[in-house]
């Protein structure tokens, strides 16, 4: 199975038996998957989950050599974060985002990785080249506002958060108050803490 890199990967198989089978059918020169980018990507995922970072990196890199793909780049970004190399992780994430420019889920994941890397200028650069529909997504707007705040563009962030529409994030996780945190930073820096937090940003109100 060697899908087009443009398509999202299938659900992954797990388990030692499948890993052994995949190695057997992939790693030797005459193996049927020897030049299959997807097989090496899959091996990278499985090895990373087992904590075999070095082998996972080799698998992801081989996948990329065979066929540049956003999925192995994402794997390398996650691996680089795990190893504490935020600068490299941010580079991998940005290249992946370039390849999947019109895939909302990939773009949101890329912005998340960039925020974990504290690559706030990169967040702003990626946001700038998104289409207008994608820019209107609440989760995307949150990362944009984060980038604005962290790069000192407080007035622009304030205009976004305190606009009539505000930022509406439909996929807020339980216990997540990151938009509230941003608003409180702006309130402190721009208004001396005198503003009242809008109810829409009180994610623990209920």
Which residues fall in each region the model found?
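Alpha-solenoid helical repeat scaffolds
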Residues: 38-42, 71-76, 105-110, 138-143, ...
């Amino acid at each position: 199975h060697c899908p087009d890199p443009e398509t999202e990967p299938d659900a992954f198989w797990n388990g030692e038996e499948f890993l052994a089978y995949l190695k057997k059918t992939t790693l030797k020169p005459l193996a049927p998957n020897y030049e299959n980018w997807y097989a090496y990507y899959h091996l990278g995922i499985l090895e990373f989950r087992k904590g075999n970072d070095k082998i996972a990196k080799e698998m992801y890199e081989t996948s990329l050599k065979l066929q540049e793909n956003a999925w192995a780049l994402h794997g390398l970004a996650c691996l680089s974060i795990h190893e504490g190399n935020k600068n490299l992780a941010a580079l991998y994430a940005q290249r992946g985002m370039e390849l999947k420019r019109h895939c909302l889920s990939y773009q949101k994941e890329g912005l998340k990785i960039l925020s974990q890397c504290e690559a706030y200028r990169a967040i702003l650069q990626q946001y700038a080249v998104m289409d207008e529909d994608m820019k209107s997504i609440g989760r995307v707007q949150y990362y944009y506002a984060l980038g604005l705040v962290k790069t000192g563009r407080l007035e622009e962030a304030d205009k976004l958060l305190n606009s009539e529409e505000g930022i509406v994030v439909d996929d807020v996780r339980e216990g997540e108050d990151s938009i509230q945190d941003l608003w409180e930073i702006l309130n402190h820096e721009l208004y001396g803490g005198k503003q009242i937090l809008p109810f829409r940003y009180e994610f623990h109100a209920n």
